[in-house]
Amino acid sequence: MVLIIEIIKIGQIGPIGQRGQSGQRGQSGQRGQSGQIGQSGQSGQSGQIGQIGQIGQIGQIGQIGQIGQIGQIGQIGQIGQIGQIGQIGQIGQIGQARRTGRTGRTVHRRMLQASSSFNISPDISICRRATRNMGEEERPLGC
């Protein structure tokens, strides 16, 4: 017996559709800006020295240590002879201020006594600071 197999023709395969386009790649985000560095603070201005009246002729001044706040004349090294200081009246001859071996700082007793003629109110706290390293027997009167 002969089998006849009828081959069914398959129609033509149509063209393959075009491949779709790939989507566009998104843009990468922008990098944020780095923060600004703050400005460094300004250094404060040094205090102003108040006005000094008039100083007349001064003879010779030896070595002056540190002048503290004027208002009380704090730590003075050695003063030679002072002639006249302008409108403050006269200061006679002041000898040598007593120096201490431990600190090298002095507060002359007569300068503290003369503060009344300068219209200077004594500031005991400054006096204590200036003489805090001195022993009791070394401190000038008024401190």
UniProtKB/Swiss-Prot annotation:
Residues 16-49 are annotated as: Disordered. Disruption phenotype: Impairs the formation of the hypoxia-typic morphotype, increases surface adherence and reduces the hypoxia fitness. InterPro entries: Collagen (IPR008160), Collagen_Structural_Proteins (IPR050938). Keywords: Cell adhesion, Repeat, Secreted, Virulence. Transmembrane segments: none annotated. It is found in: Secreted. It comes from the Eukaryota. Residues 11-97 are annotated as: 29 X 3 AA approximate tandem repeats of G-Q-I/R/S. G-Q-I/R/S repeats lie at residues 11-13, 14-16, 17-19, 20-22, 23-25, 26-28, 29-31, 32-34, 35-37, 38-40, 41-43, 44-46, 47-49, 50-52, 53-55, 56-58, 59-61, 62-64, 65-67, 68-70, 71-73, 74-76, 77-79, 80-82, 83-85, 86-88, 89-91, 92-94, 95-97. Collagen-like protein; part of the subtelomeric hrmA-associated cluster (HAC) containing genes that alter the hyphal surface (such as reduced total chitin or increased beta-glucan exposure) and perturb inter-hyphal interactions within the developing biofilms, resulting in a loss of vertically aligned polarized growing filaments. Consequently, this hypoxia-typic morphotype (called H-MORPH) with altered biofilm architecture leads to increased hypoxia fitness, increased host inflammation, rapid disease progression, and mortality in a murine model of invasive aspergillosis. Contains a tripeptide G-Q-I/S/R repeated region and lacks a canonical secretion signal. This is Subtelomeric hrmA-associated cluster protein cgnA. It comes from Aspergillus fumigatus (strain ATCC MYA-4609 / CBS 101355 / FGSC A1100 / Af293) (Neosartorya fumigata). The lineage of its organism: Eukaryota, Fungi, Dikarya, Ascomycota, Pezizomycotina. The gene is cgnA.
